[in-house]
Amino acid sequence: MAKKLTLMSKKSSLADARGGPPLRARKVALAKTSGRMLDGLLDRLAIREIVENWVLYRDAGDWERFRSVWHEDGYMMATWFQGSHEEFAAISKAGMEKGVNIVNFLGGSTIDIAGNRAVAQTKMSISQRAPVEGVMCDVVCVGRFYDFLAKRKGKWGIVLRRLFYEKDRIDPVDPSQSLKLDPEVLKRYPVGYQHLAYLQAGLGFPVKTNMPGLRGPDAERLYGLGRAWLANKPMDETFRA
């Protein structure tokens, strides 16, 4: 029995040494694994580039290239706007020309990929400057972009962008000025973006009042939509509610 085992071991080693089937099979498996890892890395790099380009193109007013980060049916949801990415670009462009001052900053990302779908969460802050109760103010809101993405014809793009609004603050640009807010107006809005909403409502924007915060039912519902997207569920109106 021992002799048979030794003989089999020698044959196996010889086959490996000569590049026989066992070695070739391992090489094929390794190549497939390496290929999948490379594809996954390239997908993540492409998605992160989309997230970064969104901010740079929007803040620079580069609307032609801004459109390139979206798929044709791309939809944008923010405190002050819910609609197609084309409408968002047009209204943002018009606002910039009238002096609306909004800039965005990015932090780290986490990206979940399932086949040709992905969900990307990215830490961000929104800074908007405008007069509030007669005082020029800056509002800074921190949160996360929550992007639903798809790969179509080999190209990743945003299908839906939603946001988590985690906390915000308001400060007079001139610290020597004092600011008094109407507490009744302030409490109409969720704590995660109540100062941003106060400012935007004062500018005449209709502000959505159920955007997700750091925690709570609205946040959990959005996480659930992310899981549904990765599970290949169709995107219906519940994703935009």
Residue map of PLM features:
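Short beta-strand edge/turn micro-motifs at domain boundaries
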Residues: K3, Q121, R144-S176, E184
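Short, surface-exposed coil-to-beta transition loops
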Residues: N104-L106, V140-F145
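A hydrophobic membrane-anchoring alpha-helix module
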Residues: L181-A241
